Amino acid sequence: MPKKKGKGKGKGKGKGKGKKDGKHDSKADRESEIEKLKSNASLWEAKFTVTDISRLEYREAARALAKANEELENQQYRAEKDTKDIIAFLKRTDFEKTATIAALEEELKRERAKSAQEKDLLVAEYMQKIDALEEMFRQRSGDFQRMQGELKTIKHYRKIKANLEEDLISIREKMYVDGRAHQESLARTEYKFYMARIRIEKEAEQKISQLAEQAHYEAVDQLGAASQTVITENIRLNEGLDYHVKEAEQLKRINVALTEKNSSLALFKETNELMKKEADSHVQSQHSEISELTAKLSTLEQALGIMSREFEQERVEMERSAGVNNTELEELEMLLAAREKELSKVKQLAQSIIEQRRELELFFHEALNHARKEIKAQQQHYRQEALKSYRWRMNEAHAGRLEFPRIRTFSNAPNSTNDVQTELEDSDKWNNLRSSNVDISDLTWEQKERLLNLLFAKLNGIKTRKAAHPPALSASSSEKIQVSSDAGSTVESPSMTFITQMTMANMTSDPFVLPALKST
């Protein structure tokens, strides 16, 4: 029993020491956490101080930007006022030139209508006379063509007759020669066939007799080997007999073909005789027709001579009357030439006016194209610099030296609240001009482009809506524009004659609305 108690006491002492060590560890952890919280609090306090300082700096920058914006709006107002004066002067000049051109064009139209009316009267009078002469000439030429056609028919009949006679003679000669040749070839073929048949029969008889004698002698001399030689000789004789039989059949076929050819030649001969009879009858009828046509030709030649004499007399009379009318026509031509000279002078004046207007338009177009190129280059440079700055700030924030900037996009996202494209679009607005004196060089390229587009619109009489704060533009030493202060009235519906009078959709590089001007 006492041993067990001693063991129990030893265990109790061990447990008490473990609890004390745990309390010391928890107190050390709590102190370390307190130190961390203090360090974090000091860090956040430093961040708050830095943020407050940056907020104050941003506020000062915003005030400076607002002041600069107000100055730019004032500059814009002055620029618009100067531009309106320029446009009013150009419009007055353009209106005067347009009125002069319209008056000259109206006079030109009257002169053209008068000359065209006089010309139409002369043309109608002469056309009536020409139509009468042409009708008479058509009648006479129709009669003459009919006579020529009948003469050609007679000549054609004569040629046909000579050709038919020559063909008939050649056919007769050919038929005679073909008949003679056919008879001779038929006789030769029959003779050859008869002689060949006799020769073959004689050769066969001789061969048979020779073979019979030879077989008899050989049968007597060599009765043992006689059977084999007789068989071979018999085979050879049979082959020779077959050959002669085939040759005889071929000669029979040749005889049949020659007989058919002879019958066809006989039929051809009969046909040629019938054709000869028909040709003779046709030639006789042609002889009678030729005699009739010859008599008719003589009468037509006499009538043609009479008609040609009458036509010559009428032609002489028409030439005499045309000579009288030519004097009147020359006087009208001289008057028309004088009118044309006057019209050419008017055209030259109008052309010079148009050239002056075109030079002004080309100057505006070149300036607008230059502004658009500069806008494109400036926007590209701004995007690159903004992206570079944004990446640098992100790298600094990752390193812990700066705060993380706002998320910024560079791809013109539709739902983005901080995109570079919106800043580029804001540079096109006019609300940053507040000063009373603004130089053209102080404007952005976007504002210069908008100003040039507005000049195009004002030059062509396009009305623009009013702006709430119209700025003014002051000319610099290098870009001064001086015009009279009184503004001319806008033209409601100008004619689409010049380059600058195209629609604004074809002239502007972006779809934004032009800024409005306040009427002075």
Swiss-Prot record:
Coiled-coil spans in chain: 27-175, 245-386
GO terms (BP aspect): motile cilium assembly
GO cellular component: ciliary basal body; cytoplasm
Annotated transmembrane regions: none
Cell location: Cytoplasm, Cytoskeleton, Cilium basal body
Chain intervals with Polar residues compositional bias: 479-492
Keyword annotations: Cell projection, Cilium, Coiled coil, Cytoplasm, Cytoskeleton
Biased composition (Low complexity): 469-478
Basic residues compositional bias, start-end: 1-21
Region feature Disordered, mapped onto this chain: 1-34, 468-492
Bias (Basic and acidic residues) ranges: 22-34
Function as written in the Swiss-Prot or TrEMBL entry: Basal body protein required in multiciliate cells to align and maintain cilia orientation in response to flow. May act by mediating a maturation step that stabilizes and aligns cilia orientation. Not required to respond to planar cell polarity (PCP) or flow-based orientation cues.
Family the entry assigns: Belongs to the BBOF1 family.
Official protein name in the record: Basal body-orientation factor 1
Biological source species: Danio rerio
